[in-house]
Amino acid sequence: MRHLIRAAALAVAVVLAAVLVPASPASARVDSRTRPIIFVHGLDPDWDFDASSNCANWNQLMTALRDWGHNAPMHTMKYYAQDTNCTDSMGSTDQNTSIWTLGYLLADWIWDHYTVRGIPVDIVGHSMGGLIARAALANTGAPGWPQYLLVEDVVTLGTPHQGSDSAYGCWYTQCEELRPNSAFLQSLPENPQGYGGTDWTLVGSDSDLHVQQSGVGMTAAHKVMYLYPDYGHSDYYTDTSPLEDADVHWNNGAGWYAWYSALRVGKWTDYALTFGTY
């Protein structure tokens, strides 16, 4: 009888292991333009208590990425109740919803649509959207959260990794969490990883008056700070020029270097999503 019980327990353990571990672990990176891309917008700071973002803001960048060879599904995520023109919804919230909760909603969506099927994804987050991605990966394995996520690349555009003084201008929960040294930011792990590894690229701009150096203020394998063009906070997804005339400071883990003929932000995003060394 004991042998039967042990055999049954072992069978259950094997089944659970099969459920909790991907059939094809993402242990080795594959450079390609074939992974689904999830686009996550940032905060709506308006005082109208009717939070909304227009996901069509991503259209120019998405069109360029397709022209450059990305042929997998692209998802623009709705999380405010009044968001418009989004392809997919991960919730119906407002500005008083904690970024931790938004991270959970994103993690749950990725799990249900891709990770459970063994498919890795990439994420592009603008502003607070980058922190939502960070929160999604940081808490996997916690009670009620997905056990893991298959996220190969994350690119953050103008994300206040160390907070933004502009967040003192509003009083929503999300604004409070975006302030420098907030309890949320202090509790948020740096460089959180998906199953098999996640390659982070942080993109900031010296002309982004809301974020500036905070845009590259997290431990990451790749960081780039634009000096020219003069990207403001809403310009990151509007420059899809193929020109290689940008002035940047960039860091791939060996210190900061100046580069005066770099890719512009749209094409840099393409390379960051495609190549693990860029």
Listing of model-derived features with the role each one plays in the protein:
Residues A28-Y278:
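Lipid deacylating catalytic domains
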